[in-house]
Amino acid sequence: MKRSKQATLSRFFKKPKTGADAVHTEAVIGKKPTDSGSPAEQKDAKSPQQVTDEPPLEPVTVTTDVVAMDTQPDLSIGSEINSKSRPKSLASFKSGKSINTDHNPELKQKFRAKLELVRNKNDEDLPVITKKTKLNATEFQWYEIKKQHRDTLLFVQVGYKYHIYGDDAEIAHAQTRLFLSPGITNLKDIGNDGVVQQGSKYIKLAYSSFPVHRIDFYTKQLVEKGFKVGHVQQMEVAALKNVENKKGPMIRELTNTFTKGTYIESGNGGSVNDVQYSSYLVALHESKGDKPTVTLLATEVSTGDVIWDSFNDDYVKSELEIRLLTLAPCEILNCGVSSSTLKMCQKYMHRNKGRLAEMNVLEEEVEDPDAQVALFFEGKANAGTCSTVLELPAMVKTLILATSRYLTHCKLDSLFLLTNNFTRYTGSYMRLSANTVASLELFANTTDHTAKGSLFWVLNRCLTVFGSRELKKWVSRPLTDRTAILQRLSAVEAIIKSIYGAESDELTTLINKLVKLLKPIPDLSKMLMRLHYGQLNRKEVYLLLRELLFVAQEFKPGSGDKYIDTNPVLGEIFNSLGIHVSDIEKLLEEINPDAARQDEALTFFVTDPPSLVDRKKDLKKVEAELQIELLALRAELNRPKLQYSSVAGIDYLIEVANKDTKKLPLEWTKISGTKSVSRFRTPTLNSLVKRHEYCVEKLKAACDIEFNMFRSRCATHYEFFRSMVVAMSQFDCLFALAKVSGQSGWVKADYVDEGGIDLKDSRHVITEKLMTNYISNDIKIRCPTVVTGPNMGGKSSLVRQIALSVLLAHIGCYVPASKAQIPITDSILCRMGAQDNIMSGQSTFMVELCECAEILRNATSKSLVLLDEIGRGTTTTDGIAIAHSVLKHFIELEALTLFITHYPLGQLLDSEDSNKCDLVHMDITNTNPPIFTYKMKPGSATDSYGLNVAGLAGIPQAIINRAEEMGKDMKHDVMYQEGVRMLTDIKKVM
């Protein structure tokens, strides 16, 4: 048997008084007073402004040891219970004392535990339900939607809160610590008609809730943890429903679903360090056959970038791996890939806490993608761009169609209308292998895979979030065209002069002006895309236009013309910033700045459109009638200065001292009260308030329609606004490179076609930021070079240092050295580090050879190749044979190669190759113990000093001594074999 609210409360408080006060108290605890509204309104009303179909929670009941209270608190809507009469914790029910748990976590935890114990005890004490129990209207709506979207966590709007039901509530509780009310979590416990099945432990759904304004907070938390979240919105307004006398529950619909790759956080700020977490959604398809073709489509909904590619891949999917490492997707759509590719994606997503989803490709999307693309663009505002998409490969078009269906649930499919944002992954950029990106630590260190300790971490001195995002692209795509590199360097030099130079000229003035404008600027790139999607609110639209105007006003049209010849990169940037001033000014002239800053709907426009004028007239008419009613009440109560009061968001209340309430007419409805006063409404006032709320909601709806139209007009300028934002992001990247390049000990490189790498006082760009007293090196690489030296002597660090210097020079940055000569390089191909691939069933040696095979296929005479101990994963004879053959290939190719090895050089190099290959080693002192100097010297190393490393690692001395004796014998054998080989070679010559 269900306890009534009044019965439960009566266990705590004295019985209501009789007489006139009884009428007012009945309105308080939920009974139907005379002329107080329709039954539907009284049943579930939480306030006069809000009508929901959700019943109130049953209050927690406490057993008979509760001390009776001396006073009777007012329990009405909006009442202010005196702190002396309100128990602060469960313990205070027994002690009568007020206990504050806010600053005592331990006490707070005990209170929650005891509260949960009482709640569970009450559930057990409930008598067995013999009649059928049905879900309420809101719960049944959730149930019907949940059956169709079982993979989605649903947030259901109920008045001014969002409710989470069933197993969704359990997940939300576990992930976000929202309070959980126990109940049904399994859909099988509910019949299709919403009736709770026999044998269920509970008669109601488990649920959690939170206020409406926290929707973004909890959505972001769950989405970032890999969940799919859906918003079920109320499609009706309570005030309109009341006045129009509509029956039945609120209409609710699933309006949006969000995943890690489709969620765009509202707000305009953010840290420049946040860009290490990419938000690319990548769709993949793989054809069948011996040489499968992989098609990739990457979309970043927050910036509008669309990147596509189609390529043939090898056994270990090295081509796909480099794209995943560079793009760093947070979500992958499997549109049909092989089991080996799927395993690779699973491993990548698991390591990066991403989301892997299945997306079936429709038959018509494969058989006739052109027709489906034309259908997608039909009737759209910029349908003329359809031709751009039709020129793409067939499977790319198929993936666009599949991804657009996936984005439709998030209302983001209009992304593909912006075809100017389409680019191919492969272009006129330096090729970087997957191992290169990982081993050189371009975006994440190899220890904990965070940004700190990466090249991007060193270079990211950007002022804006969107600038940092663009810089990440620059690092992943070094330039290979000499002219483009020199033009970028020219811009960097000019900015260095403005930052560190004493002299000032017109160009320096423009640079400093733009730097000041960018420092406080929000994430305009993300705001611009949200404008395109129709997601910006009034305040955000105003801020976007205002920030664009601030920049545009400082740069007149043609302000960069004079620099086009001398500094074309900066000249084009300045020209892109000042050409749309009039368009922005016209849009801002329509906006009331004060109202926009407050996100105020009713006064947003300076001049109201005709539709708003009529609605405001209706509202003023009702407000005039409310003033007339106030005059009548003043006369009736003989209170000439009487004014309406507002409490807790409830307006138009008549405040009366409690001592005078007995004189009031019985038909007056009590709304709220305190110890000293009570607040009422008359029947006439109730009617006027409902009309007022109706007019306000109608006006708000009209304001929303007008604002949506205005926002759409702003969105038509998307391409113009985007050109400004792109120019700002490019300047921000140049500024970041200038901040780094302007440091002491950095130098502009000389670019050559031949002559090799020549670095004086070269340093490791990352390591010198993490430690002091870094030892520099003079480096000359003219041909394939074999690097030897002791373990822990710095061989791997040195070759990474060289590669990073080459990469820095190709993105338009200075190099950490006192002098630098660097050849134009088309690729940096790296095979370093020992790792296996258990998910793909590949051993360390297999991974090593597959990556080596990729390098052999792609290397050219203009490549920089880094190979670290090739052949070490197998027997010595096989390893030497493989290393010998690989090194010989690069000697014949004449590619700049750094070949690290511990193998005997006599077995590694043929006599005819000795003059075509240089030998260097990392020096070490001959002291005991030896000291690493970390200096590169010509020639080969005499020993690897592996036993010294064994001692440092803690290997017992007895074992080291035994190994030392064994090593001497083996060394004698090797020297004997080397002598025999030399005599044989001499004999051949003679």
Curated annotation (Swiss-Prot):
It is found in: Nucleus. GO terms for cellular component: nucleus. Keywords: ATP-binding, DNA damage, DNA repair, DNA-binding, Nucleotide-binding, Nucleus. ATP binds at G789, P790, N791, M792, G793, G794, K795, S796. Residues 129-261 are annotated as: Mispair-binding domain. It holds the Pfam family MutS_V. The keyword RNA-binding does not apply. Component of the post-replicative DNA mismatch repair system (MMR). Heterodimerizes with MSH2 to form MutS beta, which binds to DNA mismatches thereby initiating DNA repair. MSH3 provides substrate-binding and substrate specificity to the complex. When bound, the MutS beta heterodimer bends the DNA helix and shields approximately 20 base pairs. Acts mainly to repair insertion-deletion loops (IDLs) from 2 to 13 nucleotides in size, but can also repair base-base and single insertion-deletion mismatches that occur during replication. Heterodimer consisting of MSH2-MSH3 (MutS beta). Forms a ternary complex with MutL alpha (MLH1-PMS1). This is DNA mismatch repair protein MSH3. It comes from Yarrowia lipolytica (strain CLIB 122 / E 150). The lineage of its organism: Eukaryota, Fungi, Dikarya, Ascomycota, Saccharomycotina.
